[in-house]
A protein has these predicted regions:
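Helix-to-loop junction immediately C-terminal to a conserved catalytic motif
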Residues: 50
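Conserved ABC transporter NBD signature motif
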Residues: 58-69, 73-74
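Conserved ABC ATPase signature
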Residues: 90, 131-135
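Conserved ABC ATPase "signature" region
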Residues: 98, 102, 109-127
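Conserved catalytic motifs of ABC-family nucleotide-binding domains
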Residues: 152
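Catalytic Walker B motif of ABC-type/P-loop ATPase nucleotide-binding domains
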Residues: 156-159
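ABC transporter nucleotide-binding domain
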Residues: 174-263
């Protein structure tokens, strides 16, 4: 069953195309990633998906319902975890959950029960009476996630769920999301963290300039666009560049540094060290970040 079905979604702002007739779908119990550099069209797409922004044309269906005609019914079945901290600083941790539950007309006794369960799940029970200002960044992020789940949604939309968190807090959030994934929750995730996307997403798309560049499973995309291994060579000279060209090795030439992509880089690593001993060579596994940079470029986006 398709939880999300987007067909030819298009958005223009004063003649500027932000999203250019994209189509994709998300299956039930799937974690689906939406990746792209700044200004690629991710946020615009997400805002159209949860009804904050009308599309110029195209269609969006959630749970088989049209987002424009059936928005009230759809809204009751989704949870949204925004990148910004939108918690009420004047309320306690527990009160933030209860107030949000009122938006969904959840009975008070049920809201109390769900609040207890969610605070326990996200390891926040000991902070239930604390004000939001007293929470660490990781705790606040977990509370935002808990709040997004108060209506027991069938679809969770996560906008940069771990941005700004330290490694410990980040991994704790990932573990909680993996537990929810194992329980059958469907999620749409936007993230700049390639490790996060590789770890959580069953499938993903990479979008740039409003267009979908690729779609697939993380490991398959890595194998196709970046091989199995990467060899990074510093101070690459002309002789080495000719060697790469003659042997038709997939690569990015970054000036003094070359990045080589290969199905098995071990032999290449040995060759570089043997024949080009002056070169500094790093041998590592290919990652989703390699794919992302190959497809979207390395120029800074602001």
């Amino acid at each position: 069953m398709k939880v999300i079905e987007v067909q030819y979604l298009h958005k223009q702002f004063n003649g500027l195309v932000a999203v250019d007739s994209i189509s994709f779908s998300v299956e039930k119990a799937e974690f689906f990633g939406l990746l792209g550099p700044n200004g690629a069209g991710k946020t615009t797409t997400i805002r159209m998906l949860y009804g904050f922004l009308p599309s110029t044309r195209g269609s969006i269906q959630l749970f088989g319902m049209d987002i424009h005609r059936d928005w009230r019914r759809i809204k009751a079945r989704i949870g949204v975890c925004q990148q910004d901290n939108t918690l009420d600083p004047d309320l306690t941790v527990e009160q933030n959950l209860h107030v949000f539950a009122e938006y969904f007309s959840i009975p008070k006794s049920e809201a109390l029960r769900r609040g207890v369960e969610l605070l326990d799940f996200f390891a926040l029970s000991h902070k239930k009476d604390a004000k939001v200002m007293e929470l660490s960044g990781g705790m606040a992020r977990r509370l935002i996630l808990a709040r997004a789940l108060i209506n027991q949604p069938d679809l969770l939309i996560l906008d940069e769920p771990t941005t700004g968190l330290d490694p410990q807090s980040k991994h704790q959030v990932w573990e909680k999301l993996e537990t929810l994934k194992g329980a059958g929750l469907t999620a749409l995730i936007t993230t700049h963290n390639m490790e996060e996307a590789s770890r959580l997403c069953d499938r993903l798309i990479i979008i740039d300039h409003g267009n979908i560049l690729v779609e697939g499973r993380p490991r398959e995309l890595i194998a196709h666009y970046a091989g199995t291994n990467v060899v990074e060579v510093e101070d690459a000279g002309q002789e080495f560049r000719e060697y790469v060209k003659l042997n038709h090795i997939e690569h990015d030439d970054l000036g003094r540094r070359m990045v080589l992509y290969c199905p098995d880089g071990s032999d290449l690593d040995h060759t570089v060290r043997e024949r080009f001993c002056t070169a500094k060579c790093i041998y590592r596994n290919s990652t989703l970040e390699d794919v992302f940079l190959r497809l979207t470029g390395r120029e800074l986006r602001e």
